[in-house]
Swiss-Prot record:
Gene, per the UniProt record: rplK
GO cellular component: cytosolic large ribosomal subunit
Name of the protein in its database record: Large ribosomal subunit protein uL11
Record-stated family: Belongs to the universal ribosomal protein uL11 family.
Transmembrane helix as UniProt keyword: no
Organism ancestry: Bacteria, Pseudomonadati, Pseudomonadota, Gammaproteobacteria, Enterobacterales
Organism: Pectobacterium carotovorum subsp. carotovorum (strain PC1)
Length: 142
């Protein structure tokens, strides 16, 4: 018989740096999950990813307090900031431009995020990423 799902916990955790401190500890402790077990499993799964990159994770907690988790790709905004070499986006994206990204970089990010995005093809996903870039105050160059 299938296990009964108790809760879904969605978090963003830095790759390879999961530890019992907030936000991981309180979110999982509330559900009665073994926090260190999750931290070890998450860090092992994300050791190939650049350390410190925020990774969205969805943890499925079952009624017997066991769990499974699925990692996603880093948020588009984080990948765009890394590609443009900036710390943060613009407070006034329509007026103040803070950096530039090439359409090749945008396409590369779209290919990276393809597994998590709902787009019919890479071009559609690239347009979506370009829209995110514009809303951050980045200029997309050809």
């Amino acid at each position: 018989m299938a296990k009964k799902v108790q809760a879904y916990v969605k978090l963003q955790v830095a790759a390879g740096m999961a530890n019992p401190s907030p936000p991981v500890g309180p979110a999982l402790g509330q559900q009665g999950v073994n926090i260190m077990e999750f931290c070890k499993a998450f860090n092992a799964k994300t050791e190939s990813v650049e350390k410190g990159l925020p990774i969205p994770v969805v943890i499925t907690v079952y009624s017997d307090r066991s769990f499974t988790f699925v990692t996603k790709t880093p948020p588009a905004a984080v990948l765009l900031k890394k590609a443009a070499g900036i710390k943060s986006g613009s407070g006034k994206p329509n007026k103040d431009k803070v950096g530039k990204v090439t359409s090749a970089q945008v396409r590369e990010i779209a290919e990276t995020k393809a597994a998590d995005m709902t787009g019919s093809d890479v071009d559609a996903m690239a347009r979506s990423i370009a829209g995110t870039a514009r809303s951050m105050g980045l200029v997309v160059e050809d």
